[in-house]
Structure formats: C-alpha cells, structure tokens
Regions:
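Soluble "head" domains of membrane/secretory-pathway proteins
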Residues: 1-130
Length: 130
C-alpha cells in the first residue's frame, strides 16, 4: 500500500550469510544454530499444531493445521536456503506460521533497521526486559 510500517522482528541473517532451514532446524553458514527462543512455539506445534494457541483466530488455526513445519518459506517448503545480500539483513518473526517477514517481502537494508527491542510485553506471562 506504499505506507511505511514499523515492525519488530528478529535478525536471523547478517549481510553475506547463507541461511538454511531443514525441518525447523536453522543453519547459519552451514553451522547448526539453536533457536532457544522458539522452544515454546515448537513444543506447542508438535503437541497440537498450535490449535489452542490460535483459538482466537480460525484462519491462523487453519494455517497451522496445514503446516508441515513451524518455519516454512513463503511457498510452504520446510527446507529452504536464503542468501542474504551484502548490506542487507534477514528478519523473521518468532511466530513463524503467521509472521509477515523476510520470507514474504525480502531482506532489509541497514537503513531500514531502527533499533533494538529491550522489552517484551507479549505474551503477558512473559513480560520483561532482555
């Protein structure tokens, strides 16, 4: 729509990185990387495909129900590789099944990044600083 929007996403890939996912496992430049911040989501995805988590939104429930993995590319592939261009960053939201991020809109230039999250206020049971 041409409007500027502010979003909060996690930087997954730095300029020049090769990011690869295989069935919810992240590899950065070929090195297996732990995404401990996703543990709660991954557990719930394996338990009930996030149906309770998304009980407030039937569309989100249907997306999760059809998903083969928690982290997929924009086409639903569970294994994919992204080459991060020089001077750009790969950003992903933690709620991967419904997040609009670099998988849909591409990488972000450094000039588009404005800050660093210091406080979490959602979910309510995890309010706190980083």
């Amino acid at each position: 729509d041409g409007k500027t929007k502010q979003i909060v996403k996690r930087v997954i890939g730095l300029p020049g990185d090769t990011i690869r996912y295989e069935n919810d496992q992240l590899y950065v430049n070929g090195k297996k990387t732990n995404e401990s911040y996703l543990k709660n989501y991954l557990t719930k995805f394996k338990d009930d495909k996030l149906q309770k988590t998304y009980s407030y939104n039937s569309f989100f429930q249907s997306l999760a129900d059809k998903a083969q993995a928690f982290t997929q590319d924009a086409n639903g592939n569970t294994s994919f590789t992204i080459e991060v261009p020089k001077g750009e960053y790969l950003l992903l939201g933690d709620d991967r099944l419904v997040s609009k991020d670099s998988r849909q809109v591409g990488t972000f230039k450094a000039s588009q990044l404005q800050g660093e999250a210091k406080l979490r206020f959602w979910p309510l049971n995890r309010i706190g600083t980083f």
